[in-house]
UniProtKB/Swiss-Prot annotation:
Cell wall formation. Coiled coil: none annotated. This is D-alanine--D-alanine ligase. Gene3D superfamilies: 3.40.50.20, ATP-grasp fold, A domain, ATP-grasp fold, B domain. Its main location: cytoplasm.
Amino acid sequence: MAAQKVGLLFGGRSGEHEVSIRSAAAIASALADPSNRDRYQVLPFYIDKEGGWHSGETAAQVLANQKPLFVEEPSDRWQFPADCRDVEVWFPILHGPNGEDGTIQGLLTLMQRPFVGSGVLGSALGMDKIAMKQAFAQASLPQVAYVAVNRSQVFSDPCRYTSLLEQIETELGYPCFVKPANLGSSVGIAKVRDRAELEAALDQAAALDRRLIIEAAIDNPREVECAVLGNDYPQASILGEITYDSDFYDYETKYTDGKAQLLIPAQLSAELQQKLQELAIAAFQAVDASGLSRLDFFLDSQGQIFINEINTLPGFTALSMYPQLWAASGVAFPDLVHRLIQLALER
């Protein structure tokens, strides 16, 4: 049987461009593994920071160097490489806005080719934290209290703005977290302890996104993650825990070597682990996810569980939590990539 042509799509216009390149390089290496070499042929497609598409040698060079392409003159963003037609199944590994929010998934759907990961609905719900929480609430999943805010409320007349501040203080209190609803990698998130910090954080978040979410803080929570794999009958991995010395798991902590430690497996009772796995699958199904997702949870000092979020297209470097959780669960990286492609073809 001829090798299937896999369109490996990476880069993108989000702030997670470099992470996407590293994820794609790891996936390309897994597809070159002896177990996959005869099954798949990789066709790399790179989207530069201006939105231009590149294929062939240019995309392969970015993949090999693991460095973004410097574009002197933006290419025609409406012109897709001709070899897109050769792709039999797509593996998009674009992180952040335009990559995991349903945008690229809609384009691939129009191309009438199968692709790895969630469809338009699951991706959109997984990206927008407000819509995500509404879906979780519908499924009766445990969450911290939150207030949803539009940018217009932040930049409104003083009376309405003061009313918003009072609502947040009454319903959530301090400390609390202010987050843009549609940005990944903890970008724009701030922990606030008084009204002055709240106002500054709202201004910062509203400059980044039209939709904001403010969440009640949990005192010194444990942060536990679970990987999910599958379509209609998903499976959950063992659990992992993230530990760090900073005030919360912010962008700097997430992407600076040595600032955070991954503990796999997490030290949890068998009963608690089973409960978290069940909740991970329930959350996966609540947003109509498919293929893969990583579920993030908080545990308070009493052992109470709160679901934080779902990431429908998690980091995929060899050091990322998602593949590490599956490796610890007995699924090696090359086999994980193979399974994801097969799940795309089955859907």
